[in-house]
Amino acid sequence: DYGPSGIRANALCPGWVETPMGDRSMESLMTKHGISLGDAYRLVTQHIPLRRPATADEIAACCLFLASDESSIVTGTTLVADGGGLAVDLTEVAWQQEGP
């Protein structure tokens, strides 16, 4: 209904992002495994194709793209910015590593 008025609706779905919020998410892994923050991020990203978390600037760039004229034809879609995590079955990987 709003498309002809130039209003678009999209979603951005990031994976792990190295931020203070992401750091807090790593605390249980750090405690459980006795590892550093950097090692915790490496542990959670070891099975995604890029093997690293995103930066806040990278996620901001995705937001800027979706808000810009360069994406004027993009609507009704989801931009997944997860380093390729969607391309692998992370549920299966976690199941194999941790068990039921």
Q: What spans do the regions from the language model cover?
A:
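C-terminal helical subdomain
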Residues: 11, 19, 35-70, 74, ...
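Active-site catalytic pocket residues across diverse enzymes, especially alpha/beta-hydrolases
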Residues: 2, 29, 70
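Short, flexible catalytic-loop segment of classical short-chain dehydrogenase/reductase
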Residues: 14-24, 28
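Short-chain dehydrogenase/reductase
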Residues: 24-35, 100
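Short C-terminal tail/terminal secondary-structure segment
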Residues: 64, 75-100
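Short, small/polar-rich loop/turn modules that mediate ligand/substrate recognition or access, typified
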Residues: 3, 8, 74-76
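A short alpha-helix capping/helix-coil boundary motif
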Residues: 4-6, 22, 40-42
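Catalytic loop of short-chain dehydrogenase/reductase
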Residues: 1-5, 16-17, 46, 85-87
